[in-house]
């Protein structure tokens, strides 16, 4: 399930991210890549230990926990502290699958990566190329979103970033351990929750809505891993 979540960050927050990232000390992005990914990764990252990384990461996580669409689609258990990357002209990231388990720099946090996420901090007008292409059972999907928008997709998906041909592509990327490990179950719950919200707008007060909400929460209770 690939979901586009618009306007996770507002204009002021995007401007703050860009200002802070302009003064950051960028390093080779391969420092966070697995053995296989290291062979195809060519970008820059903010060091995880930098104050810029901590400030911006905390801002993004707060925004995510207050975003209803993100909560509904992901059902997050733990959000990995966001990382930040930059692709300049000629840089890209070949086809790969994200590492199944991620740990932070000091080893105090370890998560199962159920969902991958990219939060765009530069818009399509800022660069050419740099499309994020995700492969699933229905084919390939190429994504270039406005600054502040988020794309989420199953972490077991093959994906790649095309080389940038103009400008710089800056983004935050991170992973989420969901309450629901199985992506099929997670998708069913998201579709059910979406239908309930639409029915609430159209036929508020209908007793059947209470039954549907009960089905949703009982499935969540049965499948959730706390």
Swiss-Prot record:
Signal peptide: none annotated. 2-oxoglutarate binds at residue 169. InterPro entries: Oxoglu/Fe-dep_dioxygenase_dom, PKHD_C, PKHD_hydroxylase, Pro_4_hyd_alph, Pro_4_hyd_alph_FE2OG_OXY. Gene3D superfamilies: q2cbj1_9rhob like domain, Rabenosyn, Rab binding domain. The keyword Ligase does not apply. It holds the Pfam family PKHD_C. Its cofactor is Fe(2+); L-ascorbate. The keyword Flavoprotein does not apply. PROSITE patterns: FE2OG_OXY. Its EC number is 1.14.11.-. Fe cation binds at residues 96, 98, 159. One of its GO terms (molecular function) is 2-oxoglutarate-dependent dioxygenase activity. This is PKHD-type hydroxylase Bind_0236.
């Amino acid at each position: 399930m690939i979901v586009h979540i618009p306007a996770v960050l507002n204009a002021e927050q995007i401007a703050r991210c860009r200002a802070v990232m302009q003064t950051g000390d960028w390093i080779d992005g391969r420092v966070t890549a697995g053995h296989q990914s290291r062979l195809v990764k060519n970008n820059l990252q903010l060091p995880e230990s930098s104050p810029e990384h901590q400030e911006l990461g905390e801002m993004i996580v707060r925004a995510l926990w207050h975003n209803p669409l993100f909560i509904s689609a992901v059902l997050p258990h733990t959000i990995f502290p966001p990382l930040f990357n930059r692709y300049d002209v000629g840089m890209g990231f070949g086809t790969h699958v994200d590492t199944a388990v991620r740990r932070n720099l000091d080893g105090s946090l370890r998560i199962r990566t159920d969902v991958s996420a990219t939060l765009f901090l530069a818009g399509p007008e800022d660069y050419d190329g740099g499309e994020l292409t995700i492969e699933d059972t229905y084919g390939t999907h190429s994504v270039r979103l406005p600054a502040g928008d988020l794309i989420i997709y199953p972490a077991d998906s093959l994906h790649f970033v095309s080389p940038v041909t103009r400008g710089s592509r800056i983004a935050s990327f991170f992973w989420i351990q969901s309450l629901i490990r199985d992506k099929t179950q997670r998708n069913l719950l998201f579709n059910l929750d979406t239908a309930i919200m639409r029915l609430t707008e159209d036929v508020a007060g209908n007793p059947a809505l209470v039954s549907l909400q009960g089905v949703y929460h009982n499935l969540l209770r049965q499948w959730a891993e706390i």
